From Swiss-Prot:
Membrane side Cytoplasmic: residue ranges: 127-434
Main location group: endoplasmic reticulum
Residues exposed to the Lumenal side: 1-105
Region (Disordered): 415-434
Gene assigned in the entry: MMM1
TM segment ranges: 106-126
Highest taxon above the source species: Eukaryota
GO molecular function, one term: lipid binding
Domain writeup: The SMP-LTD domain is a barrel-like domain that can bind various types of glycerophospholipids in its interior and mediate their transfer between two adjacent bilayers.
Function: Component of the ERMES/MDM complex, which serves as a molecular tether to connect the endoplasmic reticulum (ER) and mitochondria. Components of this complex are involved in the control of mitochondrial shape and protein biogenesis, and function in nonvesicular lipid trafficking between the ER and mitochondria. The MDM12-MMM1 subcomplex functions in the major beta-barrel assembly pathway that is responsible for biogenesis of all outer membrane beta-barrel proteins, and acts in a late step after the SAM complex.
Organism: Kluyveromyces lactis (strain ATCC 8585 / CBS 2359 / DSM 70799 / NBRC 1267 / NRRL Y-1140 / WM37)
InterPro entries reported for this sequence: Mmm1 (IPR027537), MMM1_dom (IPR019411), SMP_LBD (IPR031468)
Protein's recorded name: Maintenance of mitochondrial morphology protein 1
Amino acid sequence: MEMSELLASEVVSSGPDYAKKSVDGLNMTAANGTNDTLMTLDEYLNKSLPLHLEQLILDANQKELFDSAAKSLLSSTLLAKQQQSLQIAPIQPQSSFSSQSFAEGLIVGQLSVIVALIFVIKFFVFSEGGTKTATAKSVGSASSFMDSTKNSILSTIIKRGGKDGLEVDDKDNEKSRQINSILEKTYYNVETHSPESLDWFNVLIAQTIHQFREEALQKNNILNSLNDFIERRSNELPQYLDQIKITEVDIGDDFPIFSNCIIQYSPNSNKKRLEAKIDIDLSDRLALGIETKLLLNYPKPFSAALPIKLTVSIVRFQACLTVSLTTDEQFVPTSEETNDDEMGNDKGYYLMFSFNPEYRMELEVKSLIGARSKLENIPKIASLIEYQISKWFVERCVEPRFQFVKLPSMWPRSKNTRKEKTDTDDSVSVKSND
């Protein structure tokens, strides 16, 4: 680039000098010509003048060529310099940007590694008992996620009737299909099946009640539980009542009779739940007798006491019993004292039972008030006690309210395994005791 600049400058500088030298040469030749030989004007015009003019024109053309070449060289040099400046300018910020981004990425990477190491050391190496409660929710959510994934995997392994036990999205329709399948496979038609007598069920219930009565007589379970209940509620008794004592407990000698059992769809369930309607009839005497004193505080506290004896007996009970298997998700508790651990957290099936509002309960209330002059079987007291018992029963066991009983697991377990004791086992146990 520097050589081209020097050549252009030399051409520009030498152009005028060269033309001047050519004119001076012509003058000198003309002068010399006058000294040596004299030329005529015609010869000069015909011979010498054209040569001189041609030389002048050539010199002028050369000068123009030199000027154009110099200008083109200068313009080319300027364009080359501009292009070099444009190419160099964006390269410098790009290199600076790349170096800056590399430094930032390196710093961010190192910081992320340090934070990860601190997290691991804090929560996995130096974790204490207090942090366990703080992370209980996260652990619970993780365990629930693991359980769900485990159940989804096991559902592909467990089969039902040769089919995969996969979960069904439409659970409502699946329940109705399951009920229809049960009725079909057990050959039970809800619409046309006749009521059953349940004689075999009466025998089983009678054996269970008999065993319950034997234990109550031998171990005084009912009496002990009633005394404990009275002691726990003694602080809630009003001040005008003395201590309550149990005088009689009659557990009866007869058994309930179940009959006319039919299976039907539960109302308001859209054929998604079955229930059993069973007539129950009990003719027996179930009695509870207590005695206490009514403390009179006039004219001064504890100046007089009025003895009271009450005996309440159930002599007849007739009703229609409704029994169904369900889950606790389908109903809501009516009491605020319901424990969340008893219902809601324990998944499983419950035995639901209730009685029809058209039930019959016959009560006998015997009352005796006074020490010397006694008032016996006062109707007002009998009606008041009957009303309170009926109210208690309706609020707990009469439709639309139900009672739930959690069903235990029916899977065989080793701790529940037993075998019948024989005479040899008795003799061996006696010898070991001796």
